[in-house]
């Protein structure tokens, strides 16, 4: 179980260089398109491999397209976002709660940019590292360990910045 977070209007910094693979990518479309699975199923195994490779590289080159975390990593990250954003209404309580449930919480472009700014500021100020130490001390005896790491915070900040808003699926 994980959280799939899709940019609603992502910044595209680089298109795939491989024309054939790019054609496959455009033909199949996005995971949330109604006919995605049908188009995916019709591909040959070779084309599925090409699609997967180009899709992965495209997402790495354009961090606002897609962010993923398993539930163990997502919960402390989303809780930290809430901690930084709850006081002045950047996020609503409903968005925060929906963000933990794969229920399609929608975060608009303005909110996404504010989240990115706050996360990057928290990294720069050393607050993320302080939070990590306190979080680990507070949860060291918990039966389940949910990791919290600065590199995950940074990856999410980069995603938010380039996402154009996002949907948590």
Predicted regions and their residues:
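Acidic (Asp/Glu-rich) sequence patches and key acidic residues
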Residues: 1-169
């Amino acid at each position: 179980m994980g959280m799939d977070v899709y940019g609603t209007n992502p910044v595209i910094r680089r298109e795939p260089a491989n024309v054939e693979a790019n054609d496959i990518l455009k033909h199949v479309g996005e995971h949330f398109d109604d006919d995605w699975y049908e188009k995916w199923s019709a591909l040959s195994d070779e084309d599925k491999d090409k699609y997967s490779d180009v899709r992965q590289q495209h997402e790495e080159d354009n961090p606002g397209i897609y962010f993923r975390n398993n539930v163990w990593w997502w919960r402390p990250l989303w809780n930290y976002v809430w901690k930084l954003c709850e006081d002045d209404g950047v996020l609503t309580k409903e968005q925060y709660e929906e963000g933990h449930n794969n229920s399609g919480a929608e975060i608009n472009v303005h909110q996404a940019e504010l989240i990115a700014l706050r996360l990057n500021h928290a990294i720069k100020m050393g607050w993320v590292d302080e939070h990590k130490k306190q979080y680990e001390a507070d949860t060291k005896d918990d039966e389940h360990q949910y990791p919290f790491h600065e590199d995950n915070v940074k990856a999410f900040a980069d995603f938010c910045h380039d996402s154009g808003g996002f949907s948590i699926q």
